Amino acid sequence: ISDRFHFPGFQKGKQVYEMLKASDVYIMPSVSEPFGISPLEAMQMGVPSIISKQSGCAEILNHVIKTDFWDIDAMADAIYSIITYPAMHKQLKEEGLKEVNQIVWKKAGKKVIDIYNNLLNK
């Protein structure tokens, strides 16, 4: 599979974005990831993403494909679908970019403040 997949190991700075620019699909099959930022980086670069349902970011991301980390058949199907169906690739790319551009610290902070205010008012 080495002729079709890249396993670059640790990347930093520009290397990350250069690798993402050259990618058709980003996959994060983590068993446990409190909140991986790498799918957001991929989405920011317009790369459709596949993440595990068990990752923390699965709770907030909608325009990704989510699979169980142990279900390699579902993961393979997701990869195949993104590569084979241009409309799916386009939708995940465009909607994912819109979604990730809406994630800003100000909005996240307001949500936390609203939660605390709701709890205090009960």
Which residues fall in each region the model found?
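Aromatic "clamp/platform" in nucleotide-sugar-dependent glycosyltransferases that forms part
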Residues: 31
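Short glycine/serine-rich donor-binding loops of glycosyltransferases
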Residues: 36-39, 57
